[in-house]
Amino acid sequence: MTHAAASGIDSGPVTSPFDIEDYLRRVSGRVDGHLRRIAADQKRQRPARLAEAIEYALLGGGKRLRPALVLASCEALGGDPGDDGLALRFALALEMIHTYSLVHDDLPAMDDDDLRRGRPTVHKAYDEATAVLVGDGLQSLAFRHLLGTGDPRAAALAALLADGALRMVQGQALDIGAEGRKLTEDEVLELMAAKTGALISAAVVGGAIAATGSPRGLEPVGRKLGLAFQIADDLLDLTGDAAALGKRVGKDQAAGKATLPSLVGVDEARRRAGAACDEALAVLAPLGAPAEALRALARFVVTRKR
Amino acid sequence: MTHAAASGIDSGPVTSPFDIEDYLRRVSGRVDGHLRRIAADQKRQRPARLAEAIEYALLGGGKRLRPALVLASCEALGGDPGDDGLALRFALALEMIHTYSLVHDDLPAMDDDDLRRGRPTVHKAYDEATAVLVGDGLQSLAFRHLLGTGDPRAAALAALLADGALRMVQGQALDIGAEGRKLTEDEVLELMAAKTGALISAAVVGGAIAATGSPRGLEPVGRKLGLAFQIADDLLDLTGDAAALGKRVGKDQAAGKATLPSLVGVDEARRRAGAACDEALAVLAPLGAPAEALRALARFVVTRKR
């Protein structure tokens, strides 16, 4: 290690001293701790095999980007995303919805994947019926966790969660319907907005609602980051490293799936992801210092390698 | 037609002048109308195939017993289960959760059924991936419908719904784990309480919460009716008519599934269903005339032929 690196001088661009990797590490640690407690609580109920499979699915790693967006968005609007707060409950619920979608997405009848985050998928590690039930149960568990404290303020967030979850399913169905035929650019954008954009967007808006009771103008930030995230995901599938990603790459091409990079080219797709990120940053600029983490996450969404 | 039948003298037992078939017909008509509107709303969104499959699943008939229990329970406690009210929204949400569970239950990886209510199951009429997504989407849609109006009172009902849905999944998992091995009577009762009892129970308790903001002592009624309903279901599978039921009979025996009738005999199982019904009726007796429909439903649960 050079002296410069040790002293931190070269540790990031001058305009962004915020350590996003450290932030994400801290959020994951916290989210994983809570998910572990939720899974342990499930394991006190029967049957054990379902509870173990739920734990296996929930604690399989992952960047916990959606929870990070919820907490950072809450902070950005002056909220305190402390332990047991509404923002944290929403963050965990959103991650459970995301996790359920991965479990079902991997099923033989869907994407038929054997590997997820470097481990056997749930239907491989257990069986297909258990994987169906793990997904179903995680969706219920998400709503139960969010609503279980009896806090009436959770109603608006649960409605947002349900809406995002439904749009995600519509996106999956668009994706399945698209296999084997050529989508237009508009169709690809519609698919992206639903399949991935809906939950990313719900994360940003949900953090704002948890902090202030309203979306407070963050809807476009959610939409832009959702778009940027999915373009980055498609670029990583084309150009990324399977080991770093913990999943197969080149899947979209192999499945004949149209993505934005496949339609407009890698460079143009990269430019559009950057532009979407910049538009989100422009909306966040007036929020000043409290939005520092959210702005760093917006940049991470497009620059990430995993 | 004899004169006596035409004049209605023989149309029911003297102690129960309440026309439960007519009540159920009116509830189904109302529930079907609302579900049709919900499905039509989905069909304004894309993709069309998912929306059509959701409509196919939602409007496949069914007794609408759970919605009837919600509305009757609400009435029993002096509530007005009018159009667009909280009880009606909960009733529809509960029926959507029930419908999703049937769609997933019929999947090849689960019970592998080709027929449901006399029609091809969703994965037969469409395909397996669509059936997974229809179930997933219906669960989200249930919560969205219940919470979508922004009524904070919906939070408690959505928590109840989530809890019932999760217990139902645990019951399904217990059921799958039980195949091929002999369950004890306690295990069978546990399985029944979770797999079917949870939603039946949620229906009764949810109606009370919609009417008064609290379960108002109706939890035991929900539990007893859930037990009675499942025993009746198992008896119909053993002795019922496939045409009237719209599904295969003798399934449990063929699959080697332990049921209460298979463990204790048909007569004893029938006696226990009757006793559970009587216990529910005893709790409901002090509620008087407003609980007439709920008491008639309690009797229907054990006397039904479909």
Task: Identify the meaning behind each predicted range.
Chain A
Residues 1-39:
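N-terminal amphipathic/basic leader segments beginning at the initiator methionine
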Residues 44-282, 289-302:
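Mg2+-dependent prenyl diphosphate-binding active-site environment of isoprenoid biosynthetic enzymes
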